[in-house]
Curated annotation (Swiss-Prot):
Database matches in InterPro entries: PDDEXK-like_dom_sf, PDDEXK_AddAB-type, Restrct_endonuc-II-like
Gene that this polypeptide is encoded by: 69
Organism: Mycobacterium phage L5 (Mycobacteriophage L5)
Name of the protein: Gene 69 protein
Signal peptide range in chain numbering: none
Length: 290
């Protein structure tokens, strides 16, 4: 018997943002899958996110984690990811520079910056703190007070840390992870951790708010913010909250479908700009950049 199930396009916020920045870069990275220039800021961000996730889950379980242990996790994760990038691209001349720092020097610099960001995050967590939301239980056992913890049809309540989602928007499946959903003044707020510059855009947060509503059948969080881990010497703190109420399901769906239509039509026109092209990780394969 033939399986006639239709596979839906699978998208993410990062895919949409990449296409919007430059359709040609999207094609090179996502379709042609060309080699991507490595940058030390990528492992720095990944390692910090891992520390924040592990730290918050420890607190949710009633366990304390020392600064020393948190920084040890950062060291391990950073070394692992840097090692993987070095295996693929051992010549540091091919790595991204960061200001005056070449690839090799930037690896060392961001190692220390990441340790500092971990320290600032934990200091902020202990001083200001954040209240992590607990998701509602889902599934057929929800009326049984979660007696069957092995039920594969159900999802137990859990702290909203590194929260996965997979939602359908009228024929397009959108998936991703939410760093944290917090409770501020009794209301939900989606939060994303950033180790670099502030995005200055709330679309990502709007998608996260919609994902929370669709996944857990709750009212969509009205606000969202970015926790800025802080560059060297700069205090770590969340941004001012973004008002997400304009990011309705209809508006978000329309945006994904607009991009999807252009992808399916093969519209991959390059949008070159000096600053943008200089930091594009597939620029070495781009005929326009060359």
């Amino acid at each position: 018997m033939t399986d006639t199930k239709t596979l839906l396009p699978l998208r993410s916020v990062s895919q949409l943002n990449q296409y919007t920045r430059c359709p040609q870069a999207y094609k090179l990275a996502r379709i042609d899958k060309v080699w991507a220039r490595p940058a030390a800021w990528l492992p720095q961000g990944t390692a910090f996110h891992t520390v924040a996730e592990v730290y918050e889950k420890a607190l949710a379980e009633g366990r304390e984690m020392s600064l020393e242990r948190a920084q040890e996790i950062f060291r391990e994760e950073y070394a692992k990811d840097i090692g993987a990038l070095c295996d693929e691209t051992p010549n540091f001349e091919w790595w991204f520079w960061s200001g005056p720092y070449n690839g090799e020097r930037d690896i060392e610099r961001r190692f220390h910056l990441g340790l500092e960001q971990v320290e600032k995050f934990i200091a902020w967590r202990k001083d200001k703190g954040q209240q992590i939301w607990t998701t509602p239980g889902r599934g057929i056992c929800s009326t049984e007070a979660w007696k069957d913890t092995n039920c594969k049809e159900c999802e137990q309540p859990k702290p909203a840390i590194e929260l996965p989602f997979n939602i359908e928007l009228d024929g397009i499946r959108v998936r991703g992870f939410i760093d944290a959903v917090v409770v501020v003044n009794g209301e939900l707020r989606v939060r994303d951790y950033k180790t670099g510059n502030s995005p200055g855009d709330d679309f990502q947060l709007g998608v996260y708010a919609l994902a929370v509503a669709m996944t857990y059948d709750v009212e969509a969080p009205k606000t969202g913010d970015y926790f800025m881990a802080g560059k060297k010497g700069i205090k770590a703190k969340p941004t001012a909250p973004y008002d997400l109420t304009d990011w309705t399901r209809e508006r978000i769906t329309e945006r994904f479908h607009e991009v999807e239509a252009r992808i399916q039509a093969g519209d991959f026109e390059p949008l070159p700009e000096p600053d943008k092209c200089g930091f594009c990780d597939v620029n070495y394969s781009c005929p326009v950049f060359k």
